[in-house]
Regions:
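Sec-dependent N-terminal signal peptides
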Residues: 3-12
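GH16 jelly-roll
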Residues: 15-251
Length: 251
Protein backbone atom coordinates (compact mmCIF):
# COMPACT_ATOMS: atom_id res chain seq x y z
CA UNK A 1 0.00 0.00 0.00
CA UNK A 2 1.53 3.29 -1.10
CA UNK A 3 0.84 6.49 0.80
CA UNK A 4 1.21 9.83 -0.98
CA UNK A 5 2.27 12.67 1.28
CA UNK A 6 1.41 16.30 0.62
CA UNK A 7 4.62 17.99 -0.41
CA UNK A 8 5.72 21.14 -2.15
CA UNK A 9 8.08 21.28 -5.12
CA UNK A 10 10.20 24.35 -5.83
CA UNK A 11 12.61 25.20 -8.63
CA UNK A 12 15.68 27.42 -8.86
CA UNK A 13 15.69 28.58 -5.26
CA UNK A 14 19.15 29.53 -4.06
CA UNK A 15 20.41 27.24 -1.34
CA UNK A 16 23.90 26.55 0.04
CA UNK A 17 25.42 26.23 3.48
CA UNK A 18 23.01 27.93 5.91
CA UNK A 19 24.29 30.81 7.97
CA UNK A 20 25.62 29.79 11.37
CA UNK A 21 26.33 26.20 10.32
CA UNK A 22 29.80 24.74 10.85
CA UNK A 23 31.61 21.83 9.24
CA UNK A 24 31.29 18.69 11.40
CA UNK A 25 32.45 15.93 9.04
CA UNK A 26 34.02 15.69 5.61
CA UNK A 27 36.07 13.58 3.27
CA UNK A 28 38.05 15.50 0.65
CA UNK A 29 39.54 12.32 -0.88
CA UNK A 30 42.99 13.89 -1.00
CA UNK A 31 44.91 10.94 0.44
CA UNK A 32 46.29 7.89 -1.24
CA UNK A 33 43.60 5.47 -0.08
CA UNK A 34 40.01 5.25 1.08
CA UNK A 35 39.81 6.28 4.74
CA UNK A 36 38.75 3.10 6.56
CA UNK A 37 37.86 5.20 9.58
CA UNK A 38 35.13 6.86 7.53
CA UNK A 39 33.98 4.22 5.06
CA UNK A 40 33.00 0.58 5.06
CA UNK A 41 31.84 -1.67 2.23
CA UNK A 42 28.72 -3.60 1.40
CA UNK A 43 29.90 -6.82 -0.24
CA UNK A 44 27.90 -9.34 -2.24
CA UNK A 45 25.85 -10.08 -5.31
CA UNK A 46 22.38 -10.94 -4.09
CA UNK A 47 20.63 -8.29 -6.18
CA UNK A 48 20.16 -5.89 -3.23
CA UNK A 49 16.39 -6.03 -3.42
CA UNK A 50 16.45 -4.62 -6.95
CA UNK A 51 17.62 -7.61 -9.03
CA UNK A 52 20.90 -5.82 -9.78
CA UNK A 53 23.57 -7.56 -11.88
CA UNK A 54 26.76 -6.54 -10.08
CA UNK A 55 28.83 -8.09 -7.30
CA UNK A 56 29.97 -5.40 -4.85
CA UNK A 57 33.56 -5.81 -3.69
CA UNK A 58 36.06 -4.03 -1.45
CA UNK A 59 38.80 -4.40 -4.07
CA UNK A 60 41.00 -1.54 -5.19
CA UNK A 61 39.86 -2.20 -8.76
CA UNK A 62 36.33 -1.10 -7.89
CA UNK A 63 36.91 1.72 -5.40
CA UNK A 64 40.02 3.80 -4.85
CA UNK A 65 41.27 7.34 -4.24
CA UNK A 66 43.45 8.98 -6.87
CA UNK A 67 44.01 12.52 -8.11
CA UNK A 68 41.91 14.03 -5.33
CA UNK A 69 38.82 11.97 -6.19
CA UNK A 70 37.05 8.87 -4.98
CA UNK A 71 36.60 6.54 -7.95
CA UNK A 72 33.77 3.98 -7.87
CA UNK A 73 34.20 1.83 -10.94
CA UNK A 74 31.82 -0.70 -12.47
CA UNK A 75 33.66 -3.35 -14.48
CA UNK A 76 32.44 -6.06 -16.84
CA UNK A 77 34.10 -9.25 -15.61
CA UNK A 78 33.16 -12.69 -14.35
CA UNK A 79 33.32 -12.62 -10.54
CA UNK A 80 31.59 -14.76 -7.92
CA UNK A 81 28.98 -15.89 -10.41
CA UNK A 82 28.18 -12.36 -11.63
CA UNK A 83 29.05 -10.64 -14.91
CA UNK A 84 29.87 -7.26 -13.37
CA UNK A 85 31.64 -5.87 -10.32
CA UNK A 86 31.34 -2.50 -8.62
CA UNK A 87 31.55 -0.95 -5.14
CA UNK A 88 29.11 0.31 -2.53
CA UNK A 89 30.68 2.42 0.22
CA UNK A 90 28.85 3.49 3.37
CA UNK A 91 29.45 5.37 6.61
CA UNK A 92 27.26 3.05 8.70
CA UNK A 93 28.71 2.70 12.20
CA UNK A 94 31.37 5.31 11.41
CA UNK A 95 29.45 8.53 10.78
CA UNK A 96 25.71 8.96 11.26
CA UNK A 97 23.84 12.20 11.82
CA UNK A 98 20.43 13.73 12.36
CA UNK A 99 19.61 17.02 10.62
CA UNK A 100 22.06 19.32 8.91
CA UNK A 101 23.31 20.36 5.50
CA UNK A 102 25.30 17.92 3.38
CA UNK A 103 26.81 18.34 -0.05
CA UNK A 104 28.94 16.32 -2.44
CA UNK A 105 30.59 17.30 -5.71
CA UNK A 106 30.16 14.40 -8.12
CA UNK A 107 30.68 13.46 -11.76
CA UNK A 108 27.97 10.94 -12.64
CA UNK A 109 28.40 8.17 -15.24
CA UNK A 110 25.90 7.57 -18.03
CA UNK A 111 25.18 4.36 -19.94
CA UNK A 112 22.41 1.91 -20.63
CA UNK A 113 21.81 -0.06 -17.44
CA UNK A 114 24.06 2.06 -15.18
CA UNK A 115 22.65 3.30 -11.85
CA UNK A 116 24.88 5.60 -9.75
CA UNK A 117 23.63 7.02 -6.45
CA UNK A 118 24.44 9.26 -3.48
CA UNK A 119 21.93 8.41 -0.77
CA UNK A 120 21.20 7.67 2.89
CA UNK A 121 19.54 5.05 5.07
CA UNK A 122 18.35 5.19 8.68
CA UNK A 123 20.90 3.82 11.14
CA UNK A 124 18.27 1.50 12.64
CA UNK A 125 17.81 -0.51 9.45
CA UNK A 126 19.08 -3.70 11.12
CA UNK A 127 16.43 -3.37 13.83
CA UNK A 128 13.37 -2.22 11.86
CA UNK A 129 14.30 -3.16 8.26
CA UNK A 130 13.49 -1.20 5.10
CA UNK A 131 11.44 0.92 4.46
CA UNK A 132 10.69 1.55 8.15
CA UNK A 133 14.23 2.88 8.61
CA UNK A 134 13.68 5.57 5.98
CA UNK A 135 15.70 6.34 2.86
CA UNK A 136 16.81 9.69 1.42
CA UNK A 137 18.03 9.57 -2.17
CA UNK A 138 19.96 12.79 -2.73
CA UNK A 139 21.05 11.85 -6.24
CA UNK A 140 20.22 8.90 -8.46
CA UNK A 141 20.67 8.63 -12.21
CA UNK A 142 19.83 5.86 -14.65
CA UNK A 143 20.78 4.81 -18.14
CA UNK A 144 21.69 7.55 -20.63
CA UNK A 145 19.40 10.20 -19.15
CA UNK A 146 20.82 13.67 -18.55
CA UNK A 147 18.90 14.27 -15.33
CA UNK A 148 18.90 13.10 -11.73
CA UNK A 149 16.25 12.01 -9.25
CA UNK A 150 15.65 12.87 -5.58
CA UNK A 151 13.36 10.56 -3.60
CA UNK A 152 12.38 9.69 -0.05
CA UNK A 153 11.09 6.26 1.00
CA UNK A 154 9.44 5.36 4.31
CA UNK A 155 6.83 3.08 5.85
CA UNK A 156 3.25 4.22 6.24
CA UNK A 157 0.24 2.18 7.38
CA UNK A 158 2.26 -1.00 7.06
CA UNK A 159 3.27 -0.34 3.46
CA UNK A 160 5.91 1.40 1.37
CA UNK A 161 5.44 5.13 0.80
CA UNK A 162 7.63 7.27 -1.42
CA UNK A 163 7.86 10.66 -3.01
CA UNK A 164 10.30 11.62 -5.75
CA UNK A 165 11.07 14.40 -8.20
CA UNK A 166 13.42 14.67 -11.15
CA UNK A 167 15.65 17.53 -12.22
CA UNK A 168 15.67 19.26 -15.56
CA UNK A 169 18.16 18.15 -18.20
CA UNK A 170 21.86 18.95 -17.77
CA UNK A 171 25.20 17.23 -18.42
CA UNK A 172 25.45 14.93 -15.42
CA UNK A 173 28.89 13.68 -16.49
CA UNK A 174 30.35 17.06 -15.53
CA UNK A 175 30.98 17.83 -11.87
CA UNK A 176 27.97 19.22 -10.03
CA UNK A 177 27.19 19.82 -6.37
CA UNK A 178 24.36 17.72 -4.95
CA UNK A 179 23.10 18.89 -1.57
CA UNK A 180 20.66 18.02 1.18
CA UNK A 181 19.12 20.44 3.67
CA UNK A 182 17.39 18.51 6.45
CA UNK A 183 15.82 19.83 9.63
CA UNK A 184 12.90 18.88 11.86
CA UNK A 185 10.43 20.33 9.36
CA UNK A 186 11.73 19.75 5.83
CA UNK A 187 13.94 17.69 3.55
CA UNK A 188 15.24 19.72 0.60
CA UNK A 189 17.50 18.55 -2.22
CA UNK A 190 19.38 20.83 -4.60
CA UNK A 191 21.71 20.65 -7.59
CA UNK A 192 24.27 23.45 -7.83
CA UNK A 193 22.25 25.42 -5.25
CA UNK A 194 19.05 25.20 -7.29
CA UNK A 195 16.38 23.44 -5.25
CA UNK A 196 14.60 20.58 -7.02
CA UNK A 197 12.78 18.88 -4.15
CA UNK A 198 11.07 19.64 -0.85
CA UNK A 199 9.18 17.33 1.49
CA UNK A 200 7.39 18.27 4.70
CA UNK A 201 8.25 16.03 7.67
CA UNK A 202 7.27 18.32 10.55
CA UNK A 203 5.81 16.43 13.54
CA UNK A 204 6.01 13.18 11.56
CA UNK A 205 3.25 14.24 9.19
CA UNK A 206 2.34 11.49 6.75
CA UNK A 207 3.96 8.90 9.04
CA UNK A 208 7.41 10.36 8.30
CA UNK A 209 8.78 9.79 11.79
CA UNK A 210 11.68 7.77 10.34
CA UNK A 211 13.24 11.01 9.14
CA UNK A 212 13.78 12.24 12.69
CA UNK A 213 16.49 9.66 13.39
CA UNK A 214 20.16 9.40 12.45
CA UNK A 215 21.12 8.38 8.92
CA UNK A 216 24.32 7.26 7.18
CA UNK A 217 25.67 7.87 3.66
CA UNK A 218 25.96 5.40 0.78
CA UNK A 219 27.83 5.89 -2.50
CA UNK A 220 27.50 3.22 -5.16
CA UNK A 221 27.26 2.39 -8.85
CA UNK A 222 24.78 -0.40 -9.59
CA UNK A 223 24.48 -2.27 -12.87
CA UNK A 224 21.02 -3.20 -14.13
CA UNK A 225 18.00 -3.74 -11.92
CA UNK A 226 14.30 -3.12 -11.64
CA UNK A 227 14.55 0.61 -12.28
CA UNK A 228 17.20 1.03 -15.02
CA UNK A 229 16.15 -2.25 -16.61
CA UNK A 230 18.04 -5.33 -17.66
CA UNK A 231 19.27 -4.36 -21.14
CA UNK A 232 22.78 -3.38 -20.05
CA UNK A 233 25.22 -2.06 -22.67
CA UNK A 234 28.38 -4.15 -22.15
CA UNK A 235 30.49 -1.77 -24.25
CA UNK A 236 30.36 1.10 -21.74
CA UNK A 237 32.58 -0.60 -19.17
CA UNK A 238 34.57 0.24 -17.21
CA UNK A 239 32.34 3.13 -16.18
CA UNK A 240 32.92 5.17 -13.04
CA UNK A 241 31.54 7.79 -10.69
CA UNK A 242 33.97 10.40 -9.37
CA UNK A 243 33.44 12.13 -6.02
CA UNK A 244 35.47 15.24 -5.26
CA UNK A 245 34.28 15.66 -1.66
CA UNK A 246 31.46 15.14 0.83
CA UNK A 247 30.86 17.67 3.61
CA UNK A 248 28.35 17.87 6.45
CA UNK A 249 27.46 21.04 8.34
CA UNK A 250 25.32 21.51 11.43
CA UNK A 251 24.36 24.48 13.63
Amino acid sequence: MKTILFISFLLAINCGVPGGYRLVWSDEFNGGAIDQGKWGYDIGGGGWGNNEFEYYTSRWENAYVSGGFLHIKAIKESYQGKDYTSARLLTKGKFEFQYGYAEARISVPRGRGIWPAFWMLGRNIDQVSWPACGEIDIMEAINTENKVYATCHWQSNGGHAQYGKESGNFDITQFHTYSLYWDSSYIRVSVDNGQIYEMLIKDGTGNTGAFHNKFFFILNVAVGGNWPGFDVDPNQFPNEMLVDYIRVYQP
